[in-house]
Amino acid sequence: MMSGSNSGRPALVLVAHGTRSPRGVELVAALAEEVAASVGPTRVAFVDVLGPSPSEVLRELDAPAVVIPAFLASGYHVHTDVPREVADSGNADVHVTPALGPDPVLAAVLLHRLREAGWQSGDAVVLAAAGSSDPRALTDVRRAAAMLAELTGDRVEIGYVATGEPRVPDVVARVRDESGRRVFVASYLLAHGLFHSRLADAGADGVAEPLGVHAELVRLLVSRYRAGVEAVRVTAGAGAAPRHRRRVLPVR
């Protein structure tokens, strides 16, 4: 899956989780198309469920690339899968950026999605995240909730869809019982898929759409790519040999 034309710049490889939902796959492709309009060649790879894998894409490119892990928290996929895929590709001219989230830009997009779903100031918000067994990812989710809370002006509770406790329906019920307010779920997911579909049964007064294709998200990806390109240039300018330029930045 490739978007854009060859411009002589490093290709961007957008790495997502993967989903069996055709709508989710189409959304990731559409996001790549929007980013490609600004940065040129953009490839999509997946670490699970479907292909191509990051290593397959990077081997096929056999050229400098900037990899953006399109994950909203830094768990196993970011710390283990992505670096392993880069190493397995044999492509030494790869720069891996930090994970996409958490980021204040994503919090702003979440707020926009909430408003689209009918949320109003004074309504309670539950942030629905996929979940992880990695404490670092859970810390990232808490940071994301804090960023969203700064924008809503109220506490944002956290519920998990797949891994971890408490589960989203339980949090929604508790918040409603304690506050007596309407409760909306902010979907801290990139695209539609199994996890987002589960939120329909959470018992909330409204469920926001996933982050999806949004102008601010596109600009964030473009910014991450350009920072990655600059890092490649700095490394090359320092006199590193071409086959020793692989660099994986520490995740946040």
Which sequence ranges carry the predicted segments?
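Active-site-proximal alpha-helix that buttresses catalytic centers in soluble enzyme cores
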Residues: 1-252
